[in-house]
A protein has these predicted regions:
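Radical SAM/AdoMet-radical enzyme domain recognition
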Residues: 46-69, 77-192
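Conserved G/P- and acidic residue-centered "switch" motifs that form tight phosphate/ATP-binding loops
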Residues: 73
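Residues that scaffold the ATP/ADP-binding catalytic core of kinase and kinase-like folds
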Residues: 29, 33, 77, 132, ...
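Canonical Radical SAM [4Fe-4S] cluster-binding loop centered on the CxxxCxxC motif
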Residues: 10-50
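Glycine-centered loop/turn positions within well-structured domains
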Residues: 28, 131-132, 256, 282
Length: 334
């Protein structure tokens, strides 16, 4: 049999990083991510454990070396650990890194198992250390569980990066304190701009906070030294001289990072989105549920390489309006 060809798109970008959403469900309801009464998908529409596994193997065959499991909240999926263990067996055999983005509420139960399966680094999303604000933002009073989960992750030996969405008039005056706390714990921290994805209640644009402005404010408290660290993602990094820790800034709306894009995303229903900010997609579930799953999957990946757009189309116009893309971040996993 011929060796499978690597995934290279029409702009000669080599795709090596897959973000795979394993569920659209979540135990939190972050206001910028989903409405309180979110309608979740019927289970039959979501890929089964076997389908997720088979699909991931197909990607690894085609040169995906980094796989991030996300959601929704990946740790609310019941058979999640089985999947992590199965994929962990590919580490060193095509796969170089298996990682996860989680809200941390269930980490206390899972941290040791994740490490045992071969995971070494995880991203944990946390926007505030104030319990009341956490509850307002996520509509659940779960900060204590998240902090417990973080302690468990650290004790298990997992390297943690905190992801914080910067929100104007909400947590903007806590960002400096979050840096001090995270670096004190030995965690890196990355700030993210809120993105126009999916309809949510209230006006997300009211809370859009350009990180360029945040950087200026942070520089009053911290010495930010530009770093040439790269994570294979869109973040720019700084070393914080006072803490010795690392700060990342992800600015999808103010900065164009598409030229170096190495990633694709697949939703829990097996829709491959070639770009987080675009509508171009390929239905991998149809391929997986066909008579010839292996061949159809590989063809679908070739199609994805043909349609991956050169750049994203996010925009917030001069009136502060954004033509929100119809899908939620909990579908494509951020
Ligand atoms: N539930 C997990 C979590 O929260 O880490 C994984 C999925 S969540 C959709 C992934 C990341 O997307 C989180 O860091 C979250 O803060 C971020 N996110 C969700 N909606 C967003 C939006 N509209 N703009 C920017 N980031 C968003
Ligand atoms: Fe859930 Fe993550 Fe969305 Fe918050 S950001 S509602 S934790 S999926």
């Amino acid at each position: 049999m011929n060796k499978p060809t690597p995934l290279v798109d029409q702009f000669q970008r080599r795709i090596t990083y897959l973000r795979l959403s394993v569920t659209d469900r979540c135990d939190l309801r972050c206001t910028y991510c989903m409405p309180e009464r979110m309608t979740f998908l019927p289970r039959r529409e979501v890929l089964s454990l076997e389908e997720l596994h088979q699909m991931a193997l197909g990607f690894i065959d085609r040169g995906i070396t980094k796989l991030r499991l996300t959601g929704g909240e990946p740790l609310v999926r019941r058979d999640m650990l089985e999947l992590v263990h199965a994929l962990g067996r590919k580490l060193g055999d095509g796969l170089e890194e298996l990682t996860m983005t989680t809200n941390g509420t269930r980490l206390a139960d899972f941290a040791d198992d994740l490490y045992a399966a071969g995971m070494r680094r995880i991203n944990v999303s946390l926007d505030t250390l104030d319990r009341g604000m956490f509850e307002t933002l996520s509509r659940r009073d779960s900060l204590p569980q998240v902090l417990e989960g973080l302690a468990a992750a650290k004790a298990a030996g997992l390297k943690v990066k905190i992801n914080t969405v910067a929100l104007k008039g909400i947590n903007e005056d806590q960002l400096s304190g979050l840096i001090a706390w995270a670096h004190g714990e030995g965690f890196d921290l990355t700030l993210i701009e809120v993105m126009p994805l999916g309809e949510v209640e209230g006006d997300r644009i009211d809370h859009y906070l350009p990180l360029i402005a945040v950087q200026d404010t942070l520089e009053r408290d911290w010495t930010l030294v530009p770093s040439d660290h790269r994570s294979g993602g869109p973040a720019r990094y700084f070393d914080v001289a006072e803490t010795g820790g690392r700060l990342g800034l992800i600015t999808p709306l103010t900065n164009n990072f598409c030229a170096g894009c190495n990633r694709i995303r697949v939703t829990a229903t097996g829709q491959l989105y070639a770009c987080l900010g675009g509508e171009e997609r390929v239905d991998l579930r149809a391929a997986l549920r066909s008579d010839e799953p292996e061949r159809r999957l590989s063809e679908a990946l070739d199609t994805a390489m043909r349609i991956k757009p050169e750049r994203h189309h996010f925009a917030i116009d001069e009136r502060g309006q954004s033509p929100a893309l119809a899908r939620h971040m909990s579908m494509t996993g951020g």
